[in-house]
């Protein structure tokens, strides 16, 4: 048991404590909630199996080991919350907010179609982190109505979030 604790402590010390000054308390809490969702076995460390289970929970059951390995290699060691926050801090430094939001949606769009199923997005919004109320869901669908196939154009949502107006359809 002691070697495991020492390993975790060493991993925690590997992350920069400065990362906490990059975000306000609300943002840190949101990252903590995201970390908790991904840390499926609740051991305080995100590992390959946590990633696999998270993808499975989102309906993506055929994630290749190579994809998971590539994600794990983005960290220099075990991914505890400090390392997780540091990784996001580094990724967000100088990033365009539209690119960041689009990148978050792309995780949910493994085929790269630029759309997400309405039912899937709605389920995530009412069950994860800052849960949407039924009224908020209704308002969102009024602003961003899905197409006849039930697909939502998340690129338009990202544009409106960052620019305030709907993108002209060409």
From Swiss-Prot:
Which annotated residues bind Ca(2+)? 39, 41, 43, 50
Question: Do the record's keywords include Calcium?
Answer: yes
Q: Which Pfam families match?
A: EF-hand_6
PTM-bearing positions, type N,N,N-trimethylalanine:
2
Domain EF-hand span(s) in chain numbering: 26-61, 96-131, 132-167
Asked if Phosphoprotein is a keyword of the record, the answer is yes
Gene3D superfamilies membership = EF-hand
Q: Which SUPFAM superfamilies match?
A: EF-hand
Superkingdom per UniProt: Eukaryota
InterPro entries, from UniProt? Answer: EF-hand-dom_pair (IPR011992), EF_Hand_1_Ca_BS (IPR018247), EF_hand_dom (IPR002048), Myosin_RLC (IPR050403)
Q: Which residues carry this modification: Phosphothreonine?
A: 26, 36, 102
List of residues that carry Phosphoserine: 16-17, 76
Q: Name one GO cellular component term.
A: myosin complex
Misc remark: This chain binds calcium.
Q: Return the protein name.
A: Myosin regulatory light chain 2, skeletal muscle isoform type 1
User: What keywords sit in the KW lines?
Assistant: Calcium, Metal-binding, Methylation, Motor protein, Muscle protein, Myosin, Phosphoprotein, Repeat
Q: Which GO terms describe its molecular function?
A: calcium ion binding
Q: How does it assemble?
A: Myosin is a hexamer of 2 heavy chains and 4 light chains.
Organism of provenance: Oryctolagus cuniculus (Rabbit)
Taxonomic lineage is:
Eukaryota, Metazoa, Chordata, Craniata, Vertebrata
């Amino acid at each position: 048991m002691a070697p495991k604790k020492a390993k975790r402590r060493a991993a925690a010390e590997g992350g920069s404590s400065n990362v906490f000054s990059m975000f306000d308390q609300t943002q840190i809490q949101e990252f903590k909630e995201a970390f908790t969702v991904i840390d499926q076995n609740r051991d305080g460390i995100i590992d390959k199996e946590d990633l696999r289970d998270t993808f499975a929970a989102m309906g993506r059951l055929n994630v290749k080991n190579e994809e998971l390995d590539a994600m794990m290699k983005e960290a220099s060691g075990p991914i505890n919350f400090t390392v997780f926050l540091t990784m996001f801090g580094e990724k967000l430094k100088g990033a365009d907010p539209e690119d960041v939001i689009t990148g978050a949606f792309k995780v949910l769009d493994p085929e790269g179609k630029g759309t997400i199923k309405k039912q899937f997005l709605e389920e995530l919004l009412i069950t994860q982190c800052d849960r949407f109320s039924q009224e908020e869901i209704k308002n969102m669908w009024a602003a961003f109505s899905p197409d006849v196939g039930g697909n939502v154009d998340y690129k338009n949502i990202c544009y409106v979030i960052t620019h305030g107006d709907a993108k002209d359809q060409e």
